[in-house]
């Protein structure tokens, strides 16, 4: 069941492994969702990557950002006022009290992972250790997909289906645009350069899938 109209919906982006595109997903998904929602991005990762990203830019990202790692405060994410949607960039440590607090508070978990077998194995472990016990709605998002060959991503989706783990239909393809946008403190929706439109379209498709889910 989703939150009532007086409370924001909470979407947490998590994976127990670093380097999978977690912060990139959180920032760009927040930007894509902000086209229709008033969005707050909460940086709950002690590394502060989302905050670093935002501080590099001079233009507004299209959403507000707050840094918070206190588990007691993270338990109350649904009580945040003034927003219809809260996106959380979580810490990568599965035994983190902050992560546990966010998972319990979340309405939806987005689980980014590259489609490579080793990355997928770590993601499946994350699902069993941190996601399934919570009972929170979740979907895997395949990231860093080679745009020249989608076969590995298709195979990864098949593996997830066989294990009963839901996944987004959309992929996030690997473009240099993502790194360059981050270095300039911009979301992929704001960055202008090679493959910018393709990269933006990927995140808009993910946002549309989430929106369809919420309207069911």
UniProtKB/Swiss-Prot annotation:
The keyword Transit peptide does not apply. One of its GO terms (molecular function) is metal ion binding. ATP binds at residues 18-19, 21-24, 47. It comes from the Bacteria. Has an adenine-nucleotide sandwich dimer structure in common with ParA ATPases. Nucleotide-binding forces changes that create an ATP-binding pocket. Mg(2+) binds at residue 23. Belongs to the ParA family. McdA subfamily. Keywords: ATP-binding, Carbon dioxide fixation, Cytoplasm, Hydrolase, Magnesium, Metal-binding, Nucleotide-binding. SUPFAM superfamilies: P-loop containing nucleoside triphosphate hydrolases. It catalyses: ATP + H2O = ADP + phosphate + H(+). It is an enzyme of class 3 (hydrolase). Pfam families: CbiA. Its EC number is 3.6.4.-. Its main location: cytoplasm. It comes from Gloeobacter kilaueensis (strain ATCC BAA-2537 / CCAP 1431/1 / ULC 316 / JS1). The gene is mcdA. A type 2 McdA protein. It is found in: Cytoplasm; Cytoplasm, Nucleoid. Homodimerizes in the presence of ATP. Each subunit binds 1 ATP molecule; some residues cross the dimer interface to contact ATP in the other subunit. Forms a complex with McdB. One of its GO terms (cellular component) is cytoplasm. One of its GO terms (biological process) is carbon fixation. The lineage of its organism: Bacteria, Bacillati, Cyanobacteriota, Cyanophyceae, Gloeobacterales. McdA and McdB together mediate carboxysome (Cb) spacing, size, ultrastructure and probably inheritance in the cell, together they prevent Cb aggregation. McdA is an ATPase that forms dynamic gradients on the nucleoid in response to adapter protein McdB, which associates with carboxysomes. The interplay between McdA gradients on the nucleoid and McdB-bound carboxysomes result in the equal spacing of Cbs along the cell length. This is Maintenance of carboxysome distribution protein A.
